[in-house]
Amino acid sequence: MPRIKICGIRTREEARWAAEAGADALGFIFAPHSKRYIQPETAREIILSLPPLISKVGVFAQASPEHVGRIVHECSLDTIQLHGNEDPRLYRHLSVTKIKAFSFPSAPAPGNSSAAAPDFSLVETSPSSSLPTSFRELPPASLHGILLDSSAGGRTGGTGIPLPWHTPEFQDFLHQVGDLGYPLILAGGLNPDNILEAIRLTRPYGVDVSSGVERNGRKDREKIQHFISQARKESPL
């Protein structure tokens, strides 16, 4: 069964719902442009109220290593998720687990674009030609996992639009990511109705959901419970 992260937590109530439903990790977004942005002091208060054995993930975009380090310390984060065009090597000195996010347009499918993306980018086209080389060159402690997310209309993450899991191009890219040896975390338009199919088609180490467990822009307790219940089911072969 994949590990489950509920992202975009903004209140103690939302955190409690996710913890009680069995989430493995909670995500706190420290990117100021995000509508799910949370002040570090608020995140710290929520984190201090959590039960043990839940991972605390800070989501950043284009933040300096110094800024990230301060929030890691202030909020007692154990994982950081980088959502910009950061070079993961700049954060290797931080004693936390590091996840690098890549975003793809939901249509056309990855691999259909003619342009390769720059290394370490949050991309608008498939990085299939540059990603493997870039990540094989990373030194130890620079990266511990890769997250795949969707983008649409210039927005990356939290779009509610699924990735094209079924397409041969996307499946080929998944194999390339798998060859790198990093755990794969799947995001992008996941919800209680499609999570089983997404797991069956991608076999991820973990899944990450935000908008898929929201109602009217806020986390919904029943949707969180339903999502986690579905994700915990044994996926069909």
Swiss-Prot record:
Its EC number is 5.3.1.24. GO terms for biological process: L-tryptophan biosynthetic process. One of its GO terms (molecular function) is phosphoribosylanthranilate isomerase activity. Gene3D superfamilies: Aldolase class I (3.20.20.70). It catalyses: N-(5-phospho-beta-D-ribosyl)anthranilate = 1-(2-carboxyphenylamino)-1-deoxy-D-ribulose 5-phosphate. Keywords: Amino-acid biosynthesis, Aromatic amino acid biosynthesis, Isomerase, Tryptophan biosynthesis. SUPFAM superfamilies: Ribulose-phoshate binding barrel. It comes from the Bacteria. Pathway: Amino-acid biosynthesis; L-tryptophan biosynthesis; L-tryptophan from chorismate: step 3/5. It holds the Pfam family PRAI. Belongs to the TrpF family. This is N-(5'-phosphoribosyl)anthranilate isomerase. The gene is trpF.
